[in-house]
Amino acid sequence: APAHIAAIRALVVAGRFDGGAITRVQDNYVVQWAARPGPGKMLTSGGAAAVAAGSTATPGGVAVGTGPGPAHPAILPAEYERPVKGLQITPLGSTDTYAPSGFADGWPVARDSKTGTAWLAHCYASVGVGRDNPPDTGDGSELYAVIGHGPRHLDRNITVVGRVIDGIADFSALPRGTGPLGFYKTPAEQTVITRVRFATAADPRYEVLASASPAFAAYLQARANRTGFFVRPAGATDLCNVQVPVRRVAK
């Protein structure tokens, strides 16, 4: 999703997330946060934030008004899927309810052989871009992270731009919103975002198990055929039940 990622990076450079807030925490679904409104914009109720979880816009929550402005781009292209050509996909090895699935470069992906396309799956810790009803695709000023069972029905409907590889437990531990769709009813309930910086500023180092490696293939088999405690191994696994191993390493 190069256009959406570029828009998010522009918002970070402009400091638009500094002073923003976590506006929504819906149990077994998503944590959502918003940048400060751009010049000439104002906080509104419901709106794009409500649609970030695949629901219709519902009053009661706090969202950020959208529209063009400095560091606030116009409607971006729909980046819900991409050509599968060029991707090295390690098959999941189990039947998936939604589409043939696997892993590419450490990312959970699904594909459609008829259209020749592939897309990032909505799994735990995935980060997506909130949007309003089509043709709106979101501008990157509202983002969410999945904190529950993978809402795969959102696949190819909302742009997935990344995933949380460190700190998702802090998101999951936030108090749930008591308003519709998990929005906080008042600004006092929200968690204020002090600042957002690129990871390169802190230079953390992480290693991800290569999904094209023999070790990853063995890992998939182990997830599908568990031993020890298990009396009856499932013999299969769900795409979102395979957490790609990530570890932080010393510099």
Predicted regions and their residues:
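Cyclophilin-like peptidyl-prolyl cis-trans isomerases
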Residues: 1-251
